[in-house]
UniProtKB/Swiss-Prot annotation:
This is DNA repair protein RecO. The keyword DNA repair applies. GO terms for cellular component: bacterial nucleoid. InterPro entries: ARFGAP/RecO, DNA_rep/recomb_RecO_N, NA-bd_OB-fold, RecO, RecO_C. It holds the Pfam family RecO_C. It comes from Wolbachia pipientis subsp. Culex pipiens (strain wPip). The gene is recO. Involved in DNA repair and RecF pathway recombination. Keywords: DNA damage, DNA recombination, DNA repair. GO terms for biological process: DNA recombination; double-strand break repair. Belongs to the RecO family. Gene3D superfamilies: Nucleic acid-binding proteins, Recombination protein O, C-terminal domain.
């Protein structure tokens, strides 16, 4: 079996002295892993976030397979001096590595991930909104879409200030005030991102509130179900001092 595709490196693991096991998020074949040979001149090629032309081959689809790779773009030098941006890209890559099913195409998520890397690369002030959008989209693509469009109880679309931790649905201030200690806050940044408004600037504290919400549901719906540990780098984003 053989195919060719483009893909972003989401994990790299050394295998022996001269080989690597690469995990790629590809446009048409989803997440795939393969063995590739490490040469003296290829270290720069195999960095997380690098975009590659990849040729994967194996006797059977379920085999690890072999990867021949050509570098298309290495965006790493655009953000490596910004610690939070670097952590964000590596963190989301590690989330993809843990939760994406093997060999299942997720073209919309792939395109948005590529766009997020471009946003980071061009030093956009709105990159944090694009990051939260990625995590919401990941939940949606894997079947756990949050419904933050209206109050779960009354159906109203105004004054949505809480989120139910059980259902992932929004709750209005009027309904939720009496149960505030049992509900999650619904920060304005997350409200805007959910409604596809990604062009507003927010404080890091507001971004952190959004991270807490998306992180809660990523852990509940994906990591706990897979009996997998939530990535330490993702947790570190919450304690990062801007």
């Amino acid at each position: 079996m053989r195919w060719k595709d483009e893909g972003v490196i989401i994990a790299v693991k050394k295998y022996g002295d001269k080989n690597l096991i690469l995990s790629l998020f590809t446009k048409n074949h989803g997440k795939c892993r393969g063995l590739t040979r490490l040469t003296n001149n290829s270290n720069y090629k195999f960095q997380i976030s690098n975009l590659l032309h990849a040729e994967w081959s194996a006797k059977l689809p379920e085999n690890l397979g072999f990867l021949k790779c050509e570098l298309i773009e290495s965006p790493f030098h655009h953000f490596f001096q910004d610690r939070l941006k670097s952590i964000a890209i590596v963190s989301f890559s590690s989330i993809l590595e843990k939760v994406l099913p093997e060999s299942e195409s997720c073209i919309k998520l792939y395109d948005n991930f590529r766009h997020f890397i471009d946003v980071i690369k061009h030093n956009s002030q709105f990159w944090q909104s694009h990051y939260l959008n990625l995590e919401l989209l990941l939940l949606t693509q894997l079947g756990f879409k949050l419904d933050l469009s209206k109050c779960a109880v009354t159906g109203v679309k105004e004054n949505l200030q809480f989120i139910s931790p059980k259902t992932g649905r929004a709750v209005s201030k009027k309904v939720g005030d009496c149960y505030a200690d049992k509900l999650l806050p619904f920060p304005q940044m997350l409200h805007d991102v959910y409604n596809n408004n990604l062009q507003n600037s927010y404080s890091y504290q507001e971004f952190r509130l959004g991270l807490k919400i998306t992180g809660y549901f990523l852990n509940k719906y994906l990591f706990l179900q897979l009996n997998a540990k939530f990535p330490e780098l993702r947790n570190f984003m919450l304690s990062f001092e801007s």
